[in-house]
């Protein structure tokens, strides 16, 4: 099928979906391309971001974490956004697109529940009926977010098949959409999946990097040495990276979850430790067995527990423009505790992975003068029970 925009990033991406979904993807691409050129759409989107979601978000300098080093560390505060994470940015854009296409229903999948909450709030705001697929395991470990979604009128559907996590929720959501796309829009939650989703999600998240660039220039008079973001599917990271890709002096660092350690096999780091395959409508690196079955991913953080990754990250990795590293559960937990204790900010476990890598860079070379920005993609309210139980079991509280 011919497309208006390039569906590939190098060899990665594409539209590997059943023929029945092609018209829906084509309609979505057409709506997106026309909306990008429509001043009225852009004005409404900008107004919602400012007056409903609370943009621009702050860029906060860490006062205490960097003590004894020559690192200057800033946090891009997506945790302050209405809804509690960066997810709100792009769902407002997609919900406006759904209305533009005349859709009345929203289908979404969610892992940590943050995208579910964002989808529910955007649907409530814009008068759309919303149903959200969520792995049964995630329903258990993210109960506050499940209640928030239901409170805002969304139907939450637990998925018991497979590993009962995000990848299974994705499969169910796609299955639903293939039978209901005439009236429903599939609100994909990350910069992955079939074209045009990776491009749409990037464009509806790119204000993260645009704001960061303007804010750091104002505060420091120069661009950062590196911007750092966690990578599951990759939407918060691509939102941060997009405006810096052409700034070749700025390092782009994506942080995948190493879970219990890469060597344990229990991780979610397909970029560095997976193989290219086709899953979830796209060609990208993924965790798979020797005979091509999708393997279970694992992370303490539900939002990073995904066996593949967005195609633009795969491309940035293949060209060397971005570096991808991994952080274990324990390292992320330590960063979670450190930021809470020393800066009075409780981060999401997802964002704690990015912070942990920044702290590692700082501690490995305390004499190095460096300016780092971490995308604090979400707040940690949803994770306090998980962390409490772990710390209690360890006798730390």
From Swiss-Prot:
Reactions listed under catalytic activity: (1S,2R)-1-C-(indol-3-yl)glycerol 3-phosphate + L-serine = D-glyceraldehyde 3-phosphate + L-tryptophan + H2O
One Gene Ontology molecular-function label: tryptophan synthase activity
Top class in the EC scheme: lyase
Cofactor: pyridoxal 5'-phosphate
Keyword Hydrolase listed: no
Pathway terms, separated by semicolons: Amino-acid biosynthesis; L-tryptophan biosynthesis; L-tryptophan from chorismate: step 5/5
PROSITE patterns: TRP_SYNTHASE_BETA
GO cellular component entries: cytoplasm
Listed InterPro entries: Trp_synth_b_CS (IPR006653), Trp_synth_beta (IPR006654), Trp_synth_beta/beta-like (IPR023026), TrpB-like_PALP (IPR001926), TrpB-like_PALP_sf (IPR036052)
Gene3D superfamilies assigned to the protein according to its UniProt record, in alphabetical order: 3.40.50.1100
Alphabetic keyword roster: Amino-acid biosynthesis, Aromatic amino acid biosynthesis, Lyase, Pyridoxal phosphate, Tryptophan biosynthesis
EC number: 4.2.1.20
Pfam families for the chain: PALP (PF00291)
Superkingdom of source: Bacteria
Modified residues (N6-(pyridoxal phosphate)lysine): 87
Function (record text): The beta subunit is responsible for the synthesis of L-tryptophan from indole and L-serine.
PANTHER family cross-referenced by the UniProt entry: TRYPTOPHAN SYNTHASE, TRYPTOPHAN SYNTHASE-RELATED
Annotated HAMAP family: Trp_synth_beta
Protein family membership: Belongs to the TrpB family.
Quaternary data: Tetramer of two alpha and two beta chains.
Name this protein carries in UniProt: Tryptophan synthase beta chain
Species assigned in the record: Klebsiella pneumoniae (strain 342)
Organism taxonomic ancestry: Bacteria, Pseudomonadati, Pseudomonadota, Gammaproteobacteria, Enterobacterales
Gene: trpB
């Amino acid at each position: 099928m011919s497309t208006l925009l390039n569906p590939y990033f190098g060899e990665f991406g594409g539209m590997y979906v059943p023929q029945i979904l092609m018209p829906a993807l084509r309609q979505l691409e057409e709506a997106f391309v026309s909306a990008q050129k429509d001043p009225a759409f852009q004005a409404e989107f900008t107004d919602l971001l400012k007056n409903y979601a609370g943009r621009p978000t702050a860029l906060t300098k860490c006062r205490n974490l960097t003590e004894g080093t020559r690192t200057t560390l800033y946090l891009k505060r997506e945790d302050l956004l209405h809804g509690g994470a960066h997810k709100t940015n792009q769902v407002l854009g997609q919900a406006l697109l759904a209305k533009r296409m005349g859709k009345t229903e929203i289908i979404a999948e969610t892992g940590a529940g943050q995208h579910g909450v964002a989808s529910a709030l955007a649907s409530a705001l814009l008068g759309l009926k919303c149903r959200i697929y969520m792995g049964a395991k995630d329903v258990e470990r993210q109960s506050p977010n499940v209640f928030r979604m239901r409170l805002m009128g969304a139907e939450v559907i637990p998925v018991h098949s497979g590993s009962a996590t995000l990848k299974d929720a994705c499969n169910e959501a796609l299955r639903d959409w293939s039978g209901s796309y005439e009236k429903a829009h599939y609100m994909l939650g990350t910069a992955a999946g079939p074209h045009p989703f990776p491009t749409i999600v990037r464009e509806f998240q790119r204000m993260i990097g645009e704001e960061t660039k303007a804010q750091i220039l104002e505060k420091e008079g120069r661009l950062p040495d590196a911007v750092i973001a966690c990578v599951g599917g990759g939407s918060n990271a691509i939102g941060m990276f997009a405006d810096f890709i052409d700034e070749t002096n700025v390092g782009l660092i994506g942080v995948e979850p190493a879970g219990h350690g890469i060597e344990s096999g229990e991780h979610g780091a397909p970029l560095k430790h997976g193989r290219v395959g086709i899953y979830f409508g796209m060609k990208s690196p993924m965790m798979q067995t020797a005979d091509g079955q999708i393997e279970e991913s694992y992370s303490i953080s539900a939002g990073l527990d995904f066996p593949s990754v967005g195609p633009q990250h795969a491309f940035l990795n293949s060209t060397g423009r971005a570096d991808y590293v991994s952080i274990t559960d324990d390292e992320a937990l330590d960063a979670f505790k450190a930021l809470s204790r020393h800066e009075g900010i409780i981060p999401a476990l997802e964002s704690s992975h990015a912070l942990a890598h920044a702290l590692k860079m700082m501690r490995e070379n305390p004499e190095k003068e460096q300016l780092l920005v971490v995308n604090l993609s979400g707040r940690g309210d949803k994770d306090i029970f998980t962390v409490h139980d772990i710390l209690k079991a360890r006798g730390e509280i």
